[in-house]
């Protein structure tokens, strides 16, 4: 659904539990390998970034056996990572982008938010990353927001969602994920973006409920 809209995303292959193989193109290493259906970085760790076929099959086997899931292998897109929240249905609006700051990440480690970086408060990965409101030129901010809204529309997301993006050194913007049910705690990146747009947390939740109700009234 993204390709017809001119939206960039990593080329990929799917390794199902039944050993079938699907591909979105000829893949180039390194690849980022993760469970197809899980969330919250479950199954993502230090061995998720693979550089050869042997490591790829080891990771696929781990996901199949230990997590009982199919594996998704994507070409790794290096660059700055942004989260762009989107609100709305017929006229979705993008919120201010949030950037993942990897400044304190362990040296040499791939810039990926794995399970340690998200949940293990004692880890170097957790301590070395933080989400901050992105400081960007107006033109770049507008580009990120446009890609987010285009992806949101293309996948027919409703009410609210978050689009995860990577900006390469050459200025290309790739969609890594479109999360139609993203984390909504008061401390979440989505809430941070909404606050920056002048929408306080109670109003944000109220607006999401209103958007859902409007759909059912039509």
Residue ranges and their predicted role:
Residues 19-21, 81-82, 170, 212:
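Short secondary-structure boundary/hinge segments and terminal tails
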Residues 40-43, 127-128, 185-190:
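Short small-residue beta-strand/loop micro-motif enriched in glycine and branched aliphatics
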Residues 36-38, 120, 181-183:
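Short connector loops/turns at beta-strand edges and beta->alpha or beta->beta junctions
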Residues 1-72, 78-80, 91:
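Active-site nucleotide/adenylate-binding loops and adjacent lid/helix of ATP-dependent enzymes
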Residues 15, 98-100, 179:
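Residue-level structural signal for beta-strand termini and adjacent loop
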Residues 3-7, 135-218:
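ATP-dependent carboxylate activation and anion-phosphoryl transfer catalytic cores
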Residues 53-146, 167-174:
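Phosphate-binding site of ATP-dependent enzymes
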């Amino acid at each position: 659904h993204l390709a017809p809209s001119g939206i960039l995303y990593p080329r990929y292959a799917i390794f199902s539990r039944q050993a079938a193989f699907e591909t979105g193109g000829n893949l180039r290493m390194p690849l980022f390998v993760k469970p197809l259906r899980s969330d919250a970085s479950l199954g993502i760790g230090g061995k998720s970034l693979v550089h050869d076929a042997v490591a790829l099959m080891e990771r696929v086997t781990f996901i199949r056996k230990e997590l009982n899931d199919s594996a998704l292998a994507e070409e790794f897109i290096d660059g700055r990572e942004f989260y762009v929240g989107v609100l709305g249905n017929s006229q979705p609006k993008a919120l201010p982008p949030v950037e993942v700051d990897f400044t304190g990440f362990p040296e040499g480690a791939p810039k990926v938010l794995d399970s340690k970086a998200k949940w293990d408060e004692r880890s170097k990965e957790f301590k070395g990353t933080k989400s901050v409101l992105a400081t960007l030129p107006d033109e770049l901010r507008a580009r990120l927001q446009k890609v987010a809204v285009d992806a949101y529309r293309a996948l027919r997301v409703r009410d609210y969602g978050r689009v995860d993006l990577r900006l390469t050194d050459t200025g290309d913007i790739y969609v890594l994920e479109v999360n139609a049910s993203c984390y909504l705690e008061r401390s979440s990146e989505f809430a941070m973006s909404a606050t920056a747009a002048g929408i306080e947390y109670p109003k944000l939740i109220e607006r999401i409920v209103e958007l859902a109700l409007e759909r059912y009234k039509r």
